């Protein structure tokens, strides 16, 4: 299984809402990342399953550019991939697991769907909350989490990790039925 977390490379974006995919992968494994031309990767073990963690380095809106390289490098097909990314239409504290679907207005996912030519891509969307009234969407997603929001996010990462374990052990349908209705709070 290859888990692709979406985000933007570089310290400027490290703790922004849009980098939830990268932050989740760092939660799973913080040290020992290796670099390739279009991505960084690492391996970790979840409940006895070895998984590969991948961060595309092409910036969010061009995430799809890295996908053919990732798939070739790890010798996987689209069925072996789960994409993890931020979602402004979900409350902070919620995740949504899907087997397939549209990009939902997310440019990183749009790029991946275009590059792979299919919407049948497994995904975990992590809620970052709706932008405040009157705030520009770009400013919101490129803004950093508050201290309180980051506490919630750590619990969301634990929930997302458990969802991944369920996907590995019992399948994505089971994970969807268990985790799509849950919400964490601090």
From Swiss-Prot:
It comes from the Bacteria. It is found in: Cytoplasm. Signal peptide: none annotated. It is an enzyme of class 3 (hydrolase). GO terms for molecular function: peptidyl-tRNA hydrolase activity; tRNA binding. CDD domains: PTH. One of its GO terms (biological process) is protein quality control for misfolded or incompletely synthesized proteins. InterPro entries: Pept_tRNA_hydro, Pept_tRNA_hydro_CS, Pept_tRNA_hydro_sf. The active site is at 18 (proton acceptor). It catalyses: an N-acyl-L-alpha-aminoacyl-tRNA + H2O = an N-acyl-L-amino acid + a tRNA + H(+). The record marks 86 as: Stabilizes the basic form of H active site to accept a proton. TRNA binds at residues 13, 59, 61, 107. The record marks 8 as: Discriminates between blocked and unblocked aminoacyl-tRNA. Pfam families: Pept_tRNA_hydro (PF01195). Keywords: Cytoplasm, Hydrolase, RNA-binding, tRNA-binding. Its EC number is 3.1.1.29. One of its GO terms (cellular component) is cytoplasm. Hydrolyzes ribosome-free peptidyl-tRNAs (with 1 or more amino acids incorporated), which drop off the ribosome during protein synthesis, or as a result of ribosome stalling. Catalyzes the release of premature peptidyl moieties from peptidyl-tRNA molecules trapped in stalled 50S ribosomal subunits, and thus maintains levels of free tRNAs and 50S ribosomes. Belongs to the PTH family. NCBIfam families: pth (TIGR00447). Monomer. This is Peptidyl-tRNA hydrolase. It comes from Thermotoga neapolitana (strain ATCC 49049 / DSM 4359 / NBRC 107923 / NS-E).
